[in-house]
C-alpha cells in the first residue's frame, strides 16, 4: 500500500498537470478582455484569465496620453486589449490598448470610405503641402488644393474640419482627406435649375464649354450654344471669359450641371451675330425662357392629344 506522502506527491503532480492542461494561452494578435489588477510606474497589469497577469506599458494605454493612470484606469475596471507578444517563461504577455484602438480606427475609416460619409479632423499643424491633424487618433492630411479655405492655413490650426476620405492605406499608415466634395455640395446648394447665372469659362472642348458657377462647373454643350450651327467654339469663347448661362438641369447624383445659352436667344443665331449685346441683356431674359418653355409644353400636349 503506497504511503500517504507518495499519494500526496502524486496528487500534486496530477494537479500541476491539470493546471497546465487547462491553462489559458493568449496568442499574439488576439484580443482579450481583462480587469486592471495592479498599477506600476511603467504601466498596468491586467488579469485576463492567463497564467500570469498581462502587462500594458504606459505608452500603450491609449492613442492619447493619460495624465493620471490610476484615475483613467482604476483597479477592477475592465477593458479590451490586443496581445502584442508571445508568452515569456512566466506565462506573461504584453498587451496594448493603443494598437487595438488603431485597428478599430482603420476599420471605421474603411466603412466611412465605402459609404462616402464625412468625417472630422482636428487640425494640429501645417506644412507646405497642406494641413495635418487628428482623425480618430490617426494622423490625417488634407492637401492645400483640397481645402475649402486655403489662403491662411495657420488660422485653421485647432479647428475641426469636415472632410471625405481621398486615400486610406493602413499598410502605409497613409490617410489623405479632401474637402472638395463638401465644397461642391455647398456650391450646388447655391444654384437652382431654371435660373440664369453669370459664370466664367473654365475650359473649351470640341463638344462644349465648361463654365464655373458659384464654385462648381457646368457643361454648355455645343448643341445648346446657339440655334444656328457653331463651327468653332473658340471663335465665341475664351478662357476666363464672363458669360451668362441658363441652368437647365442639375443631376446631384452624377454631379452634373447642364447649361444653355441657346434658350436665351430671341432668334436662332443671335449669340453668334451679337454676342456682347446678348450677354449684356441675358440676365433680363428669364421671362423669355419661361414663355418658350410654356410654348413647348403646349406643343407637346397637342402632339399627345
From Swiss-Prot:
GO biological process, one term: translation
Keyword vocabulary terms for this entry: Repeat, Ribonucleoprotein, Ribosomal protein, RNA-binding
Signal peptide as annotated in the record: none
Segments forming domain S1 motif: 29-98, 116-180, 194-262
TM helices/strands, residue ranges: none
UniProt GO molecular function: mRNA binding; structural constituent of ribosome
Cellular component GO terms, alphabetical: ribonucleoprotein complex; ribosome
PROSITE patterns (UniProt xref): S1
Job description of the protein: Binds mRNA.
The family this protein is said to belong to: Belongs to the bacterial ribosomal protein bS1 family.
Protein name per Swiss-Prot or TrEMBL: Small ribosomal subunit protein bS1B
Organism: Synechocystis sp. (strain ATCC 27184 / PCC 6803 / Kazusa)
Name of the gene this protein is made from: rps1b
Amino acid at each position: 500500500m503506497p504511503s500517504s506522502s507518495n499519494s500526496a506527491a502524486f496528487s500534486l503532480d496530477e494537479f500541476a498537470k491539470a493546471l497546465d492542461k487547462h491553462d489559458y494561452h493568449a496568442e499574439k494578435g488576439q484580443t482579450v478582455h481583462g480587469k486592471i489588477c495592479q498599477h506600476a510606474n511603467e504601466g498596468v497589469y491586467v488579469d485576463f484569465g492567463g497564467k500570469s497577469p498581462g502587462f500594458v506599458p504606459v505608452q500603450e494605454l491609449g492613442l492619447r496620453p493619460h495624465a493620471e493612470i490610476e484615475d483613467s484606469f482604476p483597479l477592477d475596471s475592465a477593458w479590451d486589449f490586443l496581445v502584442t507578444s508571445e508568452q515569456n517563461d512566466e506565462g506573461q504577455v504584453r498587451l496594448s490598448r493603443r494598437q487595438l484602438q488603431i485597428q478599430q480606427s482603420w476599420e471605421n475609416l474603411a466603412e466611412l470610405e465605402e459609404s462616402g460619409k464625412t468625417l472630422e479632423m482636428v487640425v494640429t499643424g501645417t506644412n507646405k503641402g497642406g494641413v495635418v491633424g487628428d482623425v480618430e487618433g490617426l494622423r490625417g492630411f488634407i492637401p492645400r488644393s483640397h481645402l475649402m479655405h486655403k489662403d491662411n492655413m495657420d488660422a485653421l490650426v485647432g479647428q475641426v474640419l469636415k472632410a471625405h476620405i481621398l486615400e486610406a492605406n493602413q499598410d502605409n499608415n497613409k490617410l489623405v482627406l479632401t474637402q472638395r466634395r463638401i465644397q461642391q455640395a455647398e456650391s450646388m446648394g447655391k444654384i437652382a435649375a431654371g435660373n440664369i447665372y453669370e459664370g466664367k469659362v473654365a475650359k473649351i472642348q470640341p463638344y462644349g464649354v465648361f463654365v464655373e458657377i458659384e464654385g462648381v462647373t457646368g457643361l454648355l454643350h455645343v448643341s445648346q450654344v446657339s440655334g444656328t450651327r457653331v463651327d468653332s467654339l473658340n471663335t465665341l469663347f475664351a478662357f476666363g471669359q464672363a458669360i451668362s448661362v441658363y441652368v437647365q438641369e442639375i443631376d446631384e447624383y452624377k454631379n452634373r450641371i447642364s447649361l444653355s445659352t441657346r434658350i436665351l436667344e430671341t432668334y436662332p443665331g443671335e449669340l453668334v451675330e451679337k454676342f456682347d449685346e446678348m450677354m449684356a441683356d441675358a440676365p433680363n431674359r428669364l421671362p423669355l425662357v419661361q414663355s418658350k418653355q410654356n410654348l413647348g409644353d403646349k406643343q407637346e400636349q397637342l402632339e399627345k392629344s
